[in-house]
Regions:
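C-terminal hydrophobic helical "lid"/dimerization subdomain
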Residues: 1-3, 287-339
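Short N-terminal strand-loop motif that marks the start
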Residues: 1-62, 124-127, 131, 333-339
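Glycine-rich beta-strand-centered segment in the early N-terminal region that forms part
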Residues: 20-35, 48-95, 120, 140
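Short, well-ordered loop/turn sites that connect or cap secondary structure elements
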Residues: 74-75, 168, 249
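Mid-domain Rossmann-like dinucleotide-binding core that forms the NAD(H)/NADP(H) cofactor-binding site
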Residues: 79, 138-221
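NAD(P)H dinucleotide-binding glycine-rich loop of Rossmann-like/cofactor-binding domains
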Residues: 90-177
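Glycine-rich phosphate-binding loop and adjacent beta-alpha segment
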Residues: 195, 239-299, 332-339
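A short acidic, Gly/Pro-enriched loop at the edge of an enzyme's catalytic core
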Residues: 224-232
């Protein structure tokens, strides 16, 4: 089989690799049918990753099961979402919902970067899934795999960034400072779940147009809005934008940072203390809440497909992926996306 391999800044190529095989009765082998890059893939291709090349990349896809171990509930032909992080489903952390911190594998075990072991990437023709019953989630009927290619990471991450807060604070005012798909998904979800106001901040006019289609107000940039928002979501990876988000919170407000902060910076800690700000900077435990996020996607209240910026053939991955796109989706001619 082939796997898309990151080899240098803005450069990826197909490389041959052995076909994966079942290593236990709980494994599955899947073939991605619709895959997309996330913010981490973009950072890696831009040369910001912590691991030097070469390595297989990609950690967002909807896939079709092609083989499964005897103890697995999955069968060949099933359409499934593959979470980006490796998790066993039974250790204390997995049982507590901390699936990104599974103790059965090395810290940071994931698809798309050999940080906690080598698990391959989801831009590969075939992928072995350990603990398939714990990891894989069936794609609900009626959902388009192309629209949900980011259900491995960015879509359920966006759900987690806003849905629990709106449950705790119905009608909350939401500020989103972003540069792409995560922030746009947040706008869609926030409006669907009853946010009274959503302001999306992004210098890209095309991104702002999508946010406006979701019912958000938009701006290219802002100064801090004193006590303006109950929840702020930052997904730029830029500390100045994070500071703006923090300084815009109302008393006892919450800031979720989903940016990959590769550069250091200072935070306004005294202001945060005086306002009563809670800041969370974290990788997402996707598998724990993926079923809830997919349930919302299947409800018809949201439209994640609007964020898809183009659909491309699988063979175009080496040429198209290094280019700057909002959310390109790559599909396989040999693995139809239909059920």
């Amino acid at each position: 089989m082939r796997e898309l391999t990151y080899v240098a800044r803005r450069t990826a190529e197909w490389r041959e690799a052995p076909d994966p095989v079942l290593q236990s009765d709980s494994d599955a082998i899947v073939a991605p049918v619709a895959a997309a890059p996330c913010d981490v893939d973009s950072a890696i291709l831009a040369g910001h990753g912590p691991i030097p090349p070469p390595f297989a990349i990609g950690h967002e896809c909807v896939a079709r099961v092609v083989d499964a171990g005897e103890s697995s509930r999955f069968s060949p032909g099933n359409l499934v979402v593959v979470p980006w992080a490796i998790s066993c489903g039974t250790c204390d952390r997995c049982a507590g919902g901390l699936t990104t911190h599974c103790t059965s594998v090395p810290h940071m075990a994931m698809f798309g970067a050999p940080i906690g072991g080598s698990w391959g990437g989801l831009f590969s023709d075939l992928v072995r899934i350990p603990w398939a019953d714990a990891m894989l989630v069936p794609l609900p009927g009626g959902l388009d795999p192309m629209a949900m290619a980011s259900a491995s990471d960015n879509w359920p991450l966006a759900w987690r960034l806003v849905a629990p807060h709106l449950r705790a604070r119905p009608g909350a005012r939401v500020l989103v400072i972003a540069r792409g798909s995560i922030g746009l998904y947040v706008c869609d979800i926030a409006r669907a779940l009853g946010a009274s106001d959503v302001l999306y901040v992004d210098p890209d006019p095309a991104h702002r147009a999508i946010a406006e289609g979701y019912g958000a107000r938009t701006a290219a940039e802002i100064e801090p809005v004193h006590h303006g928002f109950d929840l702020a979501v930052e997904s730029t990876g830029r500390v100045p934008e994070l500071v703006t988000a923090l300084r815009s919170l109302a008393p006892e407000g919450f800031c979720e940072s989903a940016g990959n902060h590769f550069r250091p910076g200072e935070l306004p800690l005294l202001e945060m203390y005086l306002t009563g700000v809670t800041l969370r900077v974290a990788r997402d435990n996707v598998r724990a809440h993926l079923p809830q996020a997919l349930e919302l996607a299947a409800s018809g209240q949201v439209d994640p497909g609007r964020v898809v910026s183009g659909v491309f053939d699988w063979e175009q991955l080496p040429e198209v992926l290094p280019e700057r796109h909002l959310k390109p989706v790559f599909v396989r001619a040999d693995q139809p996306v239909g059920r």
